[in-house]
Amino acid sequence: MADPVLLHSRTVQQPRATINKLHILFHLTAILLLLYYRTTTLFYENNVPTLSWSLVTVSELFMAFIWFLGQGFRWLPISRSVFPEKSPSDVRLPGIDVFVCTADSKKEPTVEVMNTVISALALDYPPEKLSVYLSDDGGSFITLYAIKEAHEFAKSWIPFCRKYGIKTRCPEAYFSLLAEDERLLWSDLFKVEEENIKSKYEIFKKNVENVGAKDENNCPRMDRPPCVEILHDNREDEENKIPMLVYVSRERRPSYPHRFKAGALNALLRVSGIISNAPYLLVLDCDMYCNDPTSARQAMCFHLDPRMSRSLAFVQYPQIFYNVSKNDIYDSQARTTYTTKWQGMDGLRGPLLSGTGFYLKRNALFGSPNQEDKYLLHPEKNFGNSTKLIASLKSNHNIQDASIKDENSSVSILEDAKLLASCAYEANTNWGKEIGFSYECMLESTFTGYLLHCKGWTSVYLYPKRPCFMGCTTVDMKDAMVQLMKWSSELIKLGLSKFSPLTYGVSRMSILQSMCYGCFTLQPLLSVALLLYAIVPQLCLINGTALYPKVSSPWFGVFSVVFLSSLCQHLYEILSTGATFMTFWNEQRMWFIKSVSGSLFGCLDAIMKRIGIQKANLRLTNKAVDKEKLEKYEKGIFNFQGAAMFTVPLIILVILNLVCFFGGLRRVILENNIEVMFGQVFLSSFHLLLSYPILQGLIPSKRKRN
């Protein structure tokens, strides 16, 4: 039997992998020595400040534990390449259903959402095998109006992109500076057609913005029936085919749980199951447009590889943001995650599901590898009582041709689709439990991906040179902190639940993979350790109480090695990914600032939910662009407007460190004991350096008020 065509390659990152392992051994040795010093001094030395020493020791112990869990990311980092030119012919390619989710047209600009939809329609994939579904959880008039307008514009835009091989197929991005190179050196005919297309886009954009300007058209409807409309079903315009386009607004009733994004995705799973029933799904956030039309073909290089496709659940792409400033003062690009951690997990069982930009096997949501039919033994109990949905699950082929042959069958399918999008359909079924996206955690994609790995599925991570998906990130402290608080709260909830990676996960996946998940879920608790580390040594400094060895002591060298080793490892990862020292410093200070603010409030939020003081609610990040915020962000000025709650612990720590630093320094000079107190003087000064952006962000705003 001939060997299968090589569709992709896998390379271990060397010398990075070897350096990482050597550093783990070195750093672990230093940490063990440090903890040995702490514990022996506490139990065997006299005149030790027991409470302060114990608090600092516990902080260092927990930081060491989180560091140890994080080494799973560094054990086997790999890179992947794909060869889409070797992929099967269009006839043999499987179908793909694209899911785009939006919830609030006020916080998620409608034109931006439509650009994402249009870019998905324009993917370089056989149009008869591609279907795009928009989930509108707000049920607002403007979204339905806009998608109809987008459909009309797409009839001109998609043929134009195909004719000239346009790569940037999001119209807003194409007509901006992001795609300026694509518009050079073209013929006069191209320029004429481009101007015509641009004119149509401006008309489309203006129409949507004019309708959206009326508040009543933007108001989400929280009590409404389901609405499903097939805007394009591939039966017309054979010459310039465009993919199927479907609008879905699931039913909302105050008496039924909402289930947020997970509920929307499960509704799309059911509705698409009786309309197109593609074996693979692409899930996109409403602001994450398709930047490379070949992303689907690249993903199929893995899904169609017979050596791995049996157990492969999804292909994850990184989230790349087009509006990240040069300095990236808020660490919005999440460089560590997408250039270090995900590549490390890819060397194990694969990265976790990141919420957007992933190609997922539909059957993976319905069972374990080689046991996808398990839940079909009792289909009504698991999937509900829709005969069409159950039939689609049992079939191994795309049922689109059988579903929409004539107007009567189309009407019948729409009625069934509305039933599947109703609130009551999931009652007494396993949707959100063992079927579909999980309702256990509001980080629905992350938790669902975790469960997939626990069931035996694998995933891969692809970081191509040209970003396949691009989106808009937060440009002020408030939105960054609100987002972090939501993530931290849900991660802590997961880390301390019965599904904890260190208990539930470790028995179902490799130890290293469990360590990675454990690091993610427990990392928000670092906020407590860092808070203690930013308070206790400083108070002891001003009181003249030493918590660290003398500079002349060999044990001081151990503390220095741990500190410098950690910084050097971070700096090495920064430089090896092509970033600069400024990126290193920004990540250091934002790690501290976010930990003692957003993550800290996330922990408090999780506690309040646990004891019933606060209910779970969806906190949408505002994706509407504020020019003033954007200007400050691009200039590298921290903007704390609207983030008063998050700045309280930061300001308290800054004031405490200032008082303790200068008060302690005065005492050190008077008592001439710098050798004894140097560790705390240095620690306090380092905290002040990390906290400088807080003063930098607050002082200009005061000047502006004056």
Please give the residue ranges for each predicted region.
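Glycosyltransferases that elongate glycans
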Residues: 1-459, 469-474, 481, 485-706
